């Protein structure tokens, strides 16, 4: 049995991942903004076999509550073996171009809060000499594109941060997993036209669980995004700047 903290637990990907943890009898501590949604998810996870499920209401911008969150999770579960950081928003690129305040808010949620929380977790797991920190980044962070460069920049920051954190914690027995989903069919992407490259939250969840259980450092999910993003990163800047991406 693993004792797992899930932050952003009301997101579709996080909920699907939690269901897979519950099915094998793990103990879960859920954190998110909506108390009502957290309680509903917790009740469902208990029915699916979770050994224990408790909740903590928090907004990702409440940095001063990160330490109390980890303290509460550890006290509730009797310690932590792993954490999945899955919170975030899908930035409105056009709106961010018109509002520096909105741009800052989006970066706070999608990058700064993730890094701050990872920092708290890193210190705790380093002290105990073990643990897994899994963080949802995105393929959008591999190269900035005009359609979503605010979101992409935040995810690029998360990817770079987790890379450095992984190097720092490796000698301490702590694993850091960077998760890079592509297009995923969730309520957050409901307005988007779907196609062959789209994945379901459950298929992404399956990849996340395998990565957290195994030895992977960075995963693309679905896996076909790895060669796709290699191609996109390889396009010369003189050509790339002319593309409509």
Which role fits each region the language model picked out?
Residues 46-64:
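Rossmann-fold cofactor-recognition segment
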Residues 10-12:
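Conserved glycine-rich cofactor-binding loop
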Residues 24-41:
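Conserved glycine-rich Rossmann-like NAD(P)H-binding loop of the short-chain dehydrogenase/reductase
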Residues 138:
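Residue(s) in the substrate-gating loop at a strand-loop-helix junction
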Residues 82, 88-104, 147:
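Conserved mid-core segment of classical short-chain dehydrogenase/reductases
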Residues 118, 154:
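Active-site helix of classical SDR
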Residues 178, 193-230:
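C-terminal helical subdomain
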């Amino acid at each position: 049995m693993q004792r797992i903290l899930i932050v952003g637990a009301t997101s579709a990907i996080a909920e699907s991942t939690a269901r897979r943890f519950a099915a094998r009898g793990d103990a879960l501590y859920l954190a998110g903004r909506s108390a009502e949604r957290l309680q509903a998810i917790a009740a469902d996870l208990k029915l699916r076999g979770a050994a224990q499920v408790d909740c903590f209401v928090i907004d990702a911008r409440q940095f001063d509550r990160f330490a109390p969150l980890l303290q509460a999770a550890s006290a509730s579960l009797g310690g932590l073996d792993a954490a999945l950081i899955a919170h975030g928003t899908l930035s409105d690129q056009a709106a961010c171009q018109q509002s520096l305040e909105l741009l800052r808010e989006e970066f706070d949620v999608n990058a700064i809060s993730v890094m701050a929380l990872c920092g708290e977790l890193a210190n705790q797991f380093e002290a105990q000499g073990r643990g897994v920190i899994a963080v949802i980044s995105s393929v959008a962070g591999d190269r900035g594109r005009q359609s979503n460069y605010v979101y992409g920049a935040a995810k690029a920051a998360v990817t770079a941060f987790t890379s450095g954190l992984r190097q720092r914690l490796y000698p301490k027995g702590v694993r850091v997993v960077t998760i890079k989903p592509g297009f995923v069919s969730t309520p957050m992407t409901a307005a988007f036209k779907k196609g062959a490259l789209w994945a379901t939250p459950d298929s992404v969840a399956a990849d996340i669980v395998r990565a957290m259980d195994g030895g992977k450092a960075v995963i693309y999910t679905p896996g076909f995004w790895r060669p796709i993003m290699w191609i996109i990163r390889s396009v010369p800047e003189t050509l790339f700047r002319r593309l409509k991406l």
